[in-house]
């Protein structure tokens, strides 16, 4: 009898405690998943601290080749941010942020890469929305052009120049994430 009564008291307590632990764990895993990935955790911690830029591709090219590579790089970056979600998830924000930092390091022209990394230390990527990302990209592009004595890029009509995708995708993307995923799956045939 006494054992049965103890079980009656302990069992609800254990259930409540396990529920609280489950809630806490699910919230903490969503917010601080980077704790388990030190290579990702270290990137934001280094922002704005004057870290030394990494020059992966130090090869010197002639001006024409440099211009072609840098133009292609910026077309890619502008296309990526122009097609970025209006309301990105936390994962999408982290992915874009790390992509922009990594692409600055792997930029094919070493001189431009170093200057871009210095700018990113002062002005880290803004990934809260498509508008924030496109505005940030245009401003950073113009800052780099100014440092490298290149003409500034016009930010007018920026989104329209680089947007890709069907109108259905663009409309549903503004609504919510589940519809966006459904439309993406409908628009593409993955059968090969």
Swiss-Prot record:
Binding of FAD, residues: 74, 138, 141, 145, 162
Domain ERV/ALR sulfhydryl oxidase: start-end pairs: 61-162
InterPro entries, sorted: ALR/ERV, ERV/ALR_sulphydryl_oxid_sf, ERV/ALR_sulphydryl_oxidase
GO cellular component, one term: endoplasmic reticulum membrane
Cysteine disulfide partners in this protein: 138-155
UniProt entry keywords in alphabetical sequence: Cytoplasm, Disulfide bond, Endoplasmic reticulum, FAD, Flavoprotein, Membrane, Nucleus, Oxidoreductase, Signal-anchor, Transmembrane, Transmembrane helix
Catalytic activity entry: 2 R'C(R)SH + O2 = R'C(R)S-S(R)CR' + H2O2
EC number: 1.8.3.2
PROSITE patterns assigned: ERV_ALR
GO BP terms: protein folding in endoplasmic reticulum; protein refolding
Pfam families from the UniProt entry: Evr1_Alr (PF04777)
Protein's cellular compartments: Endoplasmic reticulum membrane; Cytoplasm; Nucleus
First-level EC class: oxidoreductase
Protein's job: FAD-dependent sulfhydryl oxidase that catalyzes disulfide bond formation in the endoplasmic reticulum lumen.
Name under which the protein is recorded: FAD-linked sulfhydryl oxidase erv2
Organism this protein belongs to: Schizosaccharomyces pombe (strain 972 / ATCC 24843)
Name of the gene encoding the protein in the UniProt record: erv2
